[in-house]
UniProtKB/Swiss-Prot annotation:
Protein name listed in UniProt: D-amino acid dehydrogenase
Family: Belongs to the DadA oxidoreductase family.
Gene Ontology terms: biological process: D-alanine catabolic process
Gene that specifies this protein: dadA
Originating species: Shigella dysenteriae serotype 1 (strain Sd197)
Secretion signal span: none
Keyword Flavoprotein in record: yes
Length: 432
């Protein structure tokens, strides 16, 4: 089957790889001159299935009000003048109760755990390089309340079969030795030993090269104007004067998916702006071993070979890609506070990107009401964590194979009235 994939970020390229491996003739279209040059370029670098959780959580509405008056707030909201933003925020607020949070986190962990398994298999099969580490992730708490709240997430982890350690502050240095110097600032941490890290852009570009060698065609420098539809199917992609035709089409445009699908399929995917710093390592024993997550500021610090990636925060501000100095100062403050000897912060590269976020935090993966239009978008801050699993899942569905995990509640149909998916007995389904 001829398949066109729109988007060459980590999700689009992973989709191309798995569809190619399933025997399809795949073409990837992107406006950029190469793969992973937008949202996948400089994300936080963590592959953290156990920490897969929606921003829509109990307590967030009240916290958001407090954050309005804080210099280093993890979440910022500025109205962009669109009805879509207001509708999206209202939908997000409706997902902030405990029941929705547990349901949304459960299916996010299910997909993320499966994705980590798919990445592991891909690594074993291809020996793909991306400065990866398998050292786990450590979530750091600065207050007793945060430490106590961890028990809520532990219930989901136990249901999904995810190993964990809840550590008091005196034990944090057992997994991240450099934290011994700052343990007095912390109340404890939640460590997930099976989590991984890696450079998402490096992974995506290497996978794109492998996919191209396997027969995938990449059409870079090719802006897409619109999808052409006729009745119940898509019959082409208009790119300037050219119409590119296929048997099936996959939307993986991230935050730009919503606009491209306007008038065809309604999806609640909104850009969530984030920032990162890439910092050269200064002192090896003062740098992280793997990934830490600062629960207070919602910032991750991830170790690559000779660099640290400090990333996080969320701004609901529309398609604004301006690099704001106060956000850089927040990232610098956190890394200096936790790893004062770790990196040459003054040499850091500052970056921003737009994560495609749904109001419930779960991506949209699966077929639409159009029989040949498929979606793989809306992964929010977890595109790197979920890319391989989403790509494999999409490939299975498009190829008519039964996926390894429950998938009905990942489709766009979940936003329809009266949608009741068959519930898996275990959050992670077929994971072993």
């Amino acid at each position: 089957m001829r398949v066109v994939i729109l988007g060459s970020g980590v999700v689009g390229v992973a989709s191309a790889w798995y569809l190619n491996q399933a025997g399809h003739e795949v073409t990837v279209i992107d406006r950029e001159p190469g793969a992973a040059l937008e949202t996948s370029a400089a994300n936080a670098g963590q592959i953290s299935p156990g920490y897969a959780a929606p921003w829509a959580a109990p307590g967030v509405p009240l916290k958001a009000i407090k954050w309005m008056f804080q210099r280093h707030a993890p979440l910022v909201v500025r109205l962009d003048g669109t009805q879509f933003q207001l509708k999206w925020m209202w939908q997000m607020l409706r997902n902030c109760d405990t029941s929705h949070y547990m349901e949304n986190k459960g299916r996010m962990v299910r997909l993320a755990e499966y994705s980590r398994d798919c990445l592991k298999a891909l690594r074993a099969e291809t020996n793909i390089q991306y400065e990866g580490r398998q050292g786990g992730t450590l979530q750091l708490f600065r207050t007793e309340q945060q430490y106590e709240n961890a028990t809520r997430d532990i219930a989901v982890l136990e249901d999904a079969g995810v190993p964990y350690q809840l550590l008091e502050s005196s034990r944090l240095a057992e997994v991240e030795p450099a934290l011994a110097e700052v343990a007095h600032k912390l109340t404890g941490g939640l460590q997930l030993p099976n989590d991984e890290t890696g450079d998402c852009q490096l992974f995506t570009q290497n996978l794109a090269r492998m996919a191209e060698q396997a027969g995938v065609k990449f059409r870079f420098n090719t802006p897409v104007d619109q999808l052409l539809c006729d009745g119940e199917q898509i019959y082409g992609v208009k790119c300037g004067d050219e119409v590119i035709k296929a048997d099936a089409y996959v939307m993986a445009f991230g935050s730009y998916s919503t606009a491209m699908l306007k008038g065809i399929v309604d999806i609640p995917v909104y850009p969530l702006k984030g920032y990162s710093l890439t910092i050269p390592i200064a002192q090896e024993d003062g740098a992280p071993v793997s990934t830490i997550l600062d629960e207070t500021y919602k910032i991750a610090i991830t170790r690559f070979d000779n660099r640290m990636r400090v990333g996080g925060m969320a701004e609901i501000v529309g398609f604004n890609t301006e690099l704001l100095q106060p956000r850089r100062e927040t990232l610098e403050m956190v890394v200096r506070d936790l790893y004062p000897r770790g990196g040459h912060v003054e040499q850091a590269t500052f970056w921003t990107g737009l994560r495609p976020m749904t109001p419930d935090g779960t991506p949209v993966v699966g077929r639409t009401r159009f029989k040949n239009l498929w979606l793989n978008t809306g992964h929010g801050t977890l595109g790197w964590t979920m890319a391989c699993g989403s790509g494999q899942l999409l490939s299975d569905l498009l190829s008519g194979r039964t996926p390894a995990i429950p998938y009905e509640d990942l489709s766009v149909a979940r936003y329809s009235r009266g949608f009741t998916p068959s519930r898996p007995g275990h959050l992670h389904g077929a994971h072993s």
